[in-house]
């Protein structure tokens, strides 16, 4: 396995494998995969000390594309597998990668209990609002009333807010990225892995095959008269999300209220 030396830095290519990839052209999964590979290189991780754990669906194939340890698990069960790996091998870097349907549908119970345990690992959610591998059914992240082309009728169920869920059940680092901005996602993955506790990274992504509503152009705001992108980056504002370890209760609650105000913004999407 390649390792960093004084004369050679690791690159994303060191975390790639020569296996064919059948994701659809334009799929956001490619950007997320590339960002994780770059993050591993930036952190100078040793491949034999990393485990990538996937669920089902398109994103569940991700572990096959790393020269690390990898597990392709059962529907909604990637987090228990990841917990077992971390508990048995505390020195390993464990990264869970799964879709919004996998993690917030049948896997929602494990999502909740993961927060309670707060193990030192990272969970990356591929959020495209549909079950891509099984022809585009509504995922728990799709808002009620929306009807992408894959649905015969508008979605009749309410939308789950993954960031709210993560905060309420105990994840200690929470972030959001956008798959078409790989550079930003690399930084988020690095920060999530470096966090000494349970980190959750929600990555918004288009599904060009089944979700014709929230496309690359939609995120870019090309349908708006203003032409303003729907995404903005908190790094470009004065928002400070960190709750210091010595913060008193009032200060911590103030930070949490700031977080809640960002999570519930409707006109723009914070990243």
Q: Which residue ranges define each predicted feature?
A:
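Conserved small/polar residues in nucleotide/adenosyl-binding loops
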Residues: 269-271
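Alpha-helical protein-protein interaction elements
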Residues: 7, 15, 100, 222-225, ...
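Conserved phosphate-coordination/catalytic loops
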Residues: 26, 30, 72-76, 105, ...
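Thiamine diphosphate
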Residues: 1-132, 187
């Amino acid at each position: 396995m390649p390792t960093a030396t004084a004369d050679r830095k690791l690159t994303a290519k060191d975390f790639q494998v020569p296996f064919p990839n059948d994701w659809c052209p334009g799929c956001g999964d490619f950007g997320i995969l590339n960002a994780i590979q770059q993050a591993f290189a930036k952190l100078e991780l040793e491949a034999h000390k990393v485990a990538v754990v996937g669920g089902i669906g398109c994103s569940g194939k991700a572990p096959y594309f790393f020269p690390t340890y990898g597990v392709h698990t059962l529907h909604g069960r990637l987090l228990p597998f990841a917990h077992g790996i971390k508990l048995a091998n505390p020195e390993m870097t464990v990264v869970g990668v799964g879709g919004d349907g996998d993690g917030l549908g049948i896997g929602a119970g494990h999502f909740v209990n993961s927060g309670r345990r707060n193990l030192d690992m990272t969970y990356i959610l591929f959020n495209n609002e549909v079950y891509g591998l099984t022809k585009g059914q509504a995922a728990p992240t799709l808002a009620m009333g929306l009807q992408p082309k894959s649905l015969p009728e508008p979605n009749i169920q309410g939308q789950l807010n993954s960031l709210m869920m993560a905060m309420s059940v105990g994840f200690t680092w929470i972030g959001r990225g956008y798959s078409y901005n790989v550079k930003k996602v690399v930084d988020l993955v690095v920060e999530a892995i470096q966090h000494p506790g349970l980190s959750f990274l929600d990555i918004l992504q288009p599904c060009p095959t089944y979700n014709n509503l929230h496309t690359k152009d939609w995120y870019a705001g090309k349908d708006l008269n203003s032409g303003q992108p729907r995404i903005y980056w908190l790094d470009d504002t004065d928002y400070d999300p960190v709750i210091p370890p010595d913060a008193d209760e009032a200060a911590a609650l103030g930070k949490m209220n700031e977080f809640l105000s960002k999570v519930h913004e409707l006109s723009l999407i914070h990243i």
